[in-house]
Regions:
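Non-transmembrane domains of secretory- and envelope-associated proteins
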Residues: 39-41, 104-107, 111-117, 122-171
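A short, Trp-centered hydrophobic/proline-enriched beta-strand micro-motif
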Residues: 20-37, 47
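Sec-dependent N-terminal signal peptides
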Residues: 4-13
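A mature extracytoplasmic/lumenal domain signature
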Residues: 30, 58-62, 70-72, 79, ...
Length: 171
């Protein structure tokens, strides 16, 4: 859960360092490798929009939807028919941190969020991947494909549709 939250907060503000980027959508593959070299891969799609909205649609290995709008986080887990509602606090400082990410070279930026050192890789001037070592010392890589930037995304995309028969947990 903590990894999912960190990933969501990271990418809700992913494009903050790119001054002219207002929306971002892409397919992603997230690879998490632990110290024993065990690897778990997740895949799905992301849509994100300034100032602080994101929707992650995980399709494999399990279905999960994560919505962030301002300070509200909603996680919908169809396999267990559960919804988690959580306040994530103000992420503006994080947004500013990415906006001020340090350029390493033409295709690499370094950023810091709390205790995470994040590397943002660009390819053809688009966000290609993000890598970081999480709080459990897992190597995390989020690889993006089919990236679209500055396309119109309706704000309705970021409103979770909570099934009436799901259990709702407020944290």
């Amino acid at each position: 859960m903590k990894k999912t939250l960190m990933l969501s907060l990271l990418c809700a503000n992913l494009f903050g360092f790119a001054e002219n980027l207002n929306t971002f959508s892409a397919h992603f593959v997230q690879t998490v490798e632990d110290e024993k070299k065990s690897v778990i891969k997740y895949s799905g799609d992301i849509k994100a929009k300034r100032p602080n909205m994101a929707m992650w649609n995980y399709v494999a290995p399990v279905k999960k939807e994560i919505y962030i709008k301002d300070e509200d986080l909603v996680i919908i887990e169809p396999e267990i028919e559960q919804v988690i509602l959580k306040k994530v606090g103000n992420t503006i400082a994080f947004f500013e941190m990415l906006k001020n990410a340090k350029k390493v070279d033409n295709d690499t930026y370094k950023a810091k969020y709390e205790k995470l050192n994040i590397t943002i890789h660009l390819k053809n001037n688009k966000i290609d991947s993000i890598t970081y070592l999480d709080e459990l010392e897992n190597h995390v890589k989020i690889q993006f494909t089919n990236q679209l930037e500055n396309q119109k995304i309706d704000d309705k995309v970021f409103k979770a549709k909570i099934p009436a028969d799901y259990d709702v947990v407020t944290q």
